């Protein structure tokens, strides 16, 4: 999508109209914020390109021009999450110097760095992209020529424009920058750090302008009326945000419709179901001696507190069936005893005759005694009852005739009546034991749980639960559990288990690191280039690397692992290789790995030959020949860069003083200068390996290695060279690929084609291709969203392909 959007921006932005002013609040004056002045070590205030601002000479290498933490943070606050800004500087760089103008980096991550190489005559912009990858844009240009230049590089989303001396030199489509710099990020001026990238020359007006087309502050006559790519990206982003809102709203509406459909078919009022009875929300009822209320679908009960009723004459408090508290009931007084309504009394005369009385309307009335059934037990086991003239046998089941024992109260037969008693573990709520409640032995201290246990109350009893790390001996006691001995611990397989009181500790074995439950092998020197530490000080290296720490690249070319086509040369890369077409050949566009797609260049047909006018160019496989027509006396001269070079003439290239060319019978032959280190006048710029001075040595970026002048090495996908004490690094050249989806494998530097778009991290985005997500919402290419119904599944639309993956860090944070 970046590529398509960038093309749109380039086509859309036709420059026309007049310039506008610049808001000073959007300008970051680096020199002013760093408070550079005469007292700053390593720099000297000098005459600049103009007199309106200070200019500084950067010459000494014993300098440390770095913004303080507070000043750097103030600058970063203006830059964070910005995708539209311009770096401007007016400078006069010493010839052949390779130095950093401005560097914003954290550890090894360069968020924004601008450097100019006088060794390779190019300007480089290093930045961190939105995909969190390091990117480098190289612009061939001689900036280090000891002349004044006004330089600006404007970034607008994926659109980059470079102006030098108010002339547009380059315009490119790039990946969007990522300027969310973390705390602790450093800002350096005129150097990368304390030992590398020293700029030599004069700088003036070093600024960052956080606005569209900020180059206008340096070159006010340039036009800036056109909307920028960032404007367009912002519009697309808003569309994507609205699209996401639409998707979420649609999902909510769908869920609401489903719920409404279910609501139409059911009664949704909350209720409580207790003992087969249904009670509505907030409805109250009596359950024995407890008052209950249905609250939020749950029955909540509390024990009633009964107060003695104040009864009138002829009434007395008594329990009523189905009621917890006593109520006033009518009474009768008979033979000095009090009887309640319906209560009976059997009276025996001296002759043994039984008369039955019953309390009715405050009066004991004689009633007819029912006929007594014959008893099937001996006379000695007959039991006389107070409320009946009929006797019963000993052991008669009074409970079966009815009782008022409720809940946790049970009925018990006595010799002449039935009574209620509470079950074990319960206590009476009233004196007749008709209602009982559970005794909480734990809170009342009526349990027998011993040390290392926790008392848990249960209905009618309690239980003793062992504390963590202990095992049960019996119902009331526990003993310490050795999880280590029983292999019931949580230690990693590479950890040692130590038993403790009530638990255990895990400690990683020597050679492993972690918290004990998760131990990982530790390699003292680390595993480089994507290697994995699989055992103490043992690295498993990815393909293409070897060594104890995977520090050595396998040269597939010299080791004979690769056989390139005869028309190609094998070029080694970190972790990989490619077959590059030899001089005289070019790729036909198929970009085959082994060089089979290399084909001959017809120098004669394309005009890329050096034959003079008196000879005839004849194409050869991988080259050409200048042939003299039969019977004609040819000079053998050559044509080079529009000039005639005589046969046998030798010259040095104008833009490369280290290359020597010669004309040999119409053919121009160029080679690097032969270095004779014994010659005291040898050019040390072209032959740095002949420089024996210690001051010409270079320190490796890690600070652990020293290189001699002329040495080369590869560091972070860059080819580096030590040249007279200065380190200059440039991106490794990658073979061209032609595919829709590609990926840069870990520890490698160049992209490879892949067929699965979900594996790709580099995509030729096509804005016309869309995806339909799980809620049937159309998504643009490049958009991302959290999958419906999940919290940690991120989905992306990649050229019509929907790719979803789970974020492990998100899962850990849930």
From Swiss-Prot:
GO terms for cellular component: cytoplasm; extracellular region; extracellular space. The keyword Signal applies. Residues 270-329, 636-691, 696-754 form the VWFC domain. It is found in: Secreted. GO terms for molecular function: calcium ion binding; heparin binding; protein kinase C binding. Pfam families: EGF_3 (PF12947), EGF_CA (PF07645), Laminin_G_2 (PF02210), VWC (PF00093). SMART domains: EGF, EGF_CA, LamG, TSPN, VWC, VWC_out. The keyword Repeat applies. SUPFAM superfamilies: Concanavalin A-like lectins/glucanases, EGF/Laminin, FnI-like domain, Growth factor receptor domain. Ca(2+) binds at residues 438-439, 441, 457-458, 461, 553-554, 556, 572-573, 576, 600-601, 603, 619-620, 623. One of its GO terms (biological process) is fertilization. Residues 395-437, 438-479, 480-520, 521-551, 553-599, 600-635 form the EGF-like domain. Disulfide bonds join 399-411, 405-420, 422-436, 442-455, 449-464, 466-478, 484-497, 491-506, 508-519, 523-533, 527-539, 541-550, 557-570, 564-579, 581-598, 604-617, 611-626, 628-634. It comes from the Eukaryota. May regulate neuronal differentiation, polarization and axon guidance. Homotrimer. This is Protein kinase C-binding protein NELL2. It comes from Xenopus laevis.
């Amino acid at each position: 999508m970046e590529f398509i959007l960038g093309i749109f921006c380039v086509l859309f932005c036709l420059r026309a109209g007049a310039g506008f002013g610049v808001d000073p609040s959007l300008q970051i004056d680096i020199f002013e914020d760093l408070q550079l002045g005469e007292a700053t070590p390593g720099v000297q205030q000098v005459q600049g390109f103009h007199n309106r601002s200070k200019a500084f000479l950067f010459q000494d290498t014993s300098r440390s021009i770095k913004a303080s933490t507070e000043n750097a943070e103030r600058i970063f606050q203006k830059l964070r999450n910005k995708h539209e800004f311009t770096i401007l500087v007016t400078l006069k760089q010493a010839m052949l110097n390779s130095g950093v103008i401005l560097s914003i980096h954290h550890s090894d991550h360069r968020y924004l760095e601008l450097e100019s190489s006088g060794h390779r005559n190019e300007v480089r912009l290093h930045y961190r992209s939105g995909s969190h990858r390091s990117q480098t844009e190289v612009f061939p240009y001689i900036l280090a020529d000891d002349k004044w230049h006004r330089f600006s590089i404007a970034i607008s989303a994926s659109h980059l424009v470079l102006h030098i001396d108010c002339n547009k030199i380059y315009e490119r489509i790039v990946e969007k920058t990522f300027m969310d710099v973390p705390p602790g990020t450093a800002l350096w001026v005129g150097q990368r750090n304390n030992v590398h990238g020293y700029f030599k020359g004069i700088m003036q007006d070093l600024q960052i302008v956080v606005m569209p087309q900020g180059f206008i502050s340096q070159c006010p006559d340039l036009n800036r009326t056109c909307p920028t790519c960032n404007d367009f990206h912002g519009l697309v982003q808003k569309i994507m945000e609205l699209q996401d809102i639409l998707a979420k709203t649609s999902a909510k509406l769908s869920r609401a419709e489903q719920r409404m459909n279910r609501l139409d078919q059911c009664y949704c009022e909350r209720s409580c179901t207790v003992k087969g009875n249904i009670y509505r929300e907030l409805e109250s009822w009596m359950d024995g001696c407890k008052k209950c209320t249905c609250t939020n679908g749950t029955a909540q009960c509390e024990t009633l507190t009964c107060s003695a009723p104040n009864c009138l004459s002829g009434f007395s408090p008594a329990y009523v069936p189905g009621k917890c508290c006593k109520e006033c009931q009518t009474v009768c007084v008979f033979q000095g005893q009090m009887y309640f309504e319906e209560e009976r009394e059997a009276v025996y005369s001296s002759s043994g005759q039984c008369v039955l009385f019953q309390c009715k309307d405050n009066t004991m009335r004689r009633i007819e005694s029912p006929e007594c059934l014959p008893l099937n037990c001996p006379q000695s086991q007959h039991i006389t009852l107070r409320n009946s003239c009929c006797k019963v046998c000993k052991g008669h089941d009074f409970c079966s005739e009815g009782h008022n024992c409720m809940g946790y109260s049970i009925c018990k037969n006595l010799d002449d009546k039935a009574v209620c008693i509470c079950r074990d573990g319960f206590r009476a709520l009233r004196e007749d034991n008709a209602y009982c409640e559970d005794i909480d032995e734990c809170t009342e201290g009526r349990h027998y749980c011993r040390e290392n246990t926790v008392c848990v109350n249960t209905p009618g009893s309690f239980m003793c639960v062992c504390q963590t790390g202990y095992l049960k001996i019996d119902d009331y006691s526990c003993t310490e559990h050795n999880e280590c001995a029983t292999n019931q611990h949580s230690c990693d397989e590479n950890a040692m288990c130590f038993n403790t009181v009530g638990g255990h500790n895990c400690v990683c074995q020597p050679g492993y690191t972690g918290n004990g439950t998760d131990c990982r092998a530790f390699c003292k020197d680390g595993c480089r280039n994507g290697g994995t530490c699989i055992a103490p000080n043992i690295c498993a290296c990815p393909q293409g690397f070897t060594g104890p720490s995977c520090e050595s690249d396998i040269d597939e070319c010299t080791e004979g692992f690769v056989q390139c086509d005869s028309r190609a040369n094998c070029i080694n890369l970190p972790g990989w290789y490619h077959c590059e077409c030899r001089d005289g050949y070019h790729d036909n566009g198929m970009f085959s790995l082994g060089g089979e797609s290399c084909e001959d260049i017809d120098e004669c047909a394309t005009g890329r030959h050096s034959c003079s006018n008196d000879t005839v160019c004849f194409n050869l496989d991988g080259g050409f020949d200048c042939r003299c027509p039969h019977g004609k006396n040819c000079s053998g001269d050559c044509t080079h860069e529009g000039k005639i070079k005589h046969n046998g003439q030798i010259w040095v290239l104008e833009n490369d003083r280290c290359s020597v060319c010669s004309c040999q019978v119409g053919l121009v032959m160029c080679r690097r200068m032969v270095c004779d280190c014994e010659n005291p006048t040898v050019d040390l710029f072209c032959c740095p390996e002949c420089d024996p001075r210690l001051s010409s040595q270079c320190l490796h970026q890690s600070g652990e290695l020293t290189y001699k002048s002329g040495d080369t090495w590869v560091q972070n996908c860059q080819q580096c060279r030590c040249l007279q004490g200065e380190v200059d690094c440039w991106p490794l050249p990658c073979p061209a690929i032609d595919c829709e989806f590609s990926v840069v494998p870990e520890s490698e530097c160049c992209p490879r084609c892949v067929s699965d778009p979900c594996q790709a991290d580099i995509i030729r985005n096509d804005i016309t291709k869309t995806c339909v997500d799980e809620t049937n919402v159309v998504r643009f290419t490049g958009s991302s969203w959290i999958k419906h119904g999940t919290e940690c599944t991120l989905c992306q639309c990649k050229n019509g392909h929907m790719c979803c993956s789970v974020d492990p860090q998100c899962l850990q944070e849930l």
